A protein has these predicted regions:
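The feature marks the mature, well-folded catalytic cores of soluble enzymes
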Residues: 1-259
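Ferredoxin-type iron-sulfur electron-transfer modules in oxidoreductases and energy-metabolism complexes
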Residues: 201, 235-263, 273-274, 278-331
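Short Cys/His-rich zinc-binding micro-motifs
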Residues: 266-267
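Active-site-proximal glycine-rich helix-loop-beta segment
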Residues: 270
Length: 331
């Protein structure tokens, strides 16, 4: 990305889409060079087969919340996987759809109801504060887990670096403590540089969470390694022994081929989520809900949206995805 455009998330996202072939080729090379095992999945079925070949039934696994893991239905693929995202845990416990990654749907929910859900998640009774007890339990489960499964916010293809951005710190636990880390990334999350990736991440948080940046960043460049022990390189000393990355297509190439790629500019800020929920009466809601996930889900579900519903829809987008772009992608 040229210097003049570095602070323009729309231009960054446009270049990511336009250069997707080049970025994919570069990502495969640089990730592999850093010791990651790279897998290409053309659809959710291929992703499921890869994950099931890695995570056997008898292996313990934790996961964080991400659009890709929801897209492929990680809970169905790995039934024993344990969710660690606090807001997702509460949403599931309350029977609510966690459709906005930046804002949990807890309107008109009492603190007592949330407390009950977290108490049910917690395995043992302790005197310590509830959130601290849940956090400690997640760390203990991570120490015993064979796999930590996450999505990711970006891959900087020039260095082969996986970037995670979050507020809770649980993604760091899931990606760093278990013996092996598996990250699932949509092809649209490939960036040419760290600067471009961070600008898009910041734009997502500013527009979705209304804050300048997330609390935690994790940079993962291959499996953990250290040369501190007698000058010999040792893997797995301060993190996972192996890092696997699944690069997921699952309809993204179809949108590109049909010239419907503008929705892939989406940075998952969630600004459009409340407006799009009006479309979802009677339909299964993609989680998180945004122009990209709705368009990808539509390739399979073929949502029937009335003209009146289109006329009532209104949203603003920081990367200028328009109603016309969304409507074109849904045709």
């Amino acid at each position: 990305m040229s210097q003049m455009n570095i602070y323009d998330p729309e231009m960054i996202r446009k270049e990511c889409i336009q250069e997707h072939g080049k970025l994919l080729e570069q990502a495969v090379k640089t990730l592999a060079a850093k010791g990651c095992k790279v897998h290409l999945a053309k659809d959710s079925a291929e992703a499921a087969a890869i994950i099931q070949s890695l995570c056997g039934e008898n292996q313990k696994a934790l996961c964080s919340f991400s659009s890709e893991l929801e897209e492929i239905n990680i809970k169905q693929i790995v039934p024993q996987v344990v969710q660690t995202d606090i807001e997702k845990i509460v949403a599931d416990g309350l029977g609510k759809v966690f459709y906005n990654r930046r804002r949990a749907p807890f309107d008109n929910v009492s603190s007592e109801a949330i407390t009950d859900v977290l108490k049910a998640y917690r395995k043992t009774d302790t005197e310590e504060p509830l959130f601290r007890a849940v956090s400690r339990q997640i760390k203990e489960m991570a120490n015993e887990s064979d796999w930590g499964i996450t999505g990711l916010d970006a891959i900087a293809t020039d260095t082969g670096t996986i970037i995670l951005a979050e507020d809770q710190g649980n993604e760091r636990i899931v990606s760093n403590i278990p013996a092996r880390h598996l990250a699932v990334a949509g092809l649209e999350k490939l960036y040419s540089s760290n600067d471009d990736a961070l600008e898009s991440i910041h734009a997502a948080w500013k527009n979705g969470a209304r804050k300048d940046a997330p609390v935690y960043y994790s940079y993962i460049t291959g499996p953990s390694r250290t040369g501190d022990i007698e000058g010999a390189m040792v893997c797995g000393m301060h993190g996972p022994l192996a890092v696997h990355v699944i690069l997921l297509d699952n309809g993204r190439s179809t949108l590109l081929e049909q010239e419907k790629s503008d929705v892939l500019k989406c940075i998952e800020c969630g600004k459009c989520a409340d407006a799009l929920m009006r479309f979802m009466n009677g339909y299964e809601v993609p989680a998180p809900l945004n122009c990209k996930t709705l368009s990808l889900a539509n390739l399979k579900n073929k949502y029937q949206i009335t003209e009146d519903a289109w006329n009532m829809l209104s949203f603003t987008c920081p990367v200028n995805i328009t109603m016309d772009d969304l409507r074109k992608s849904m045709q």
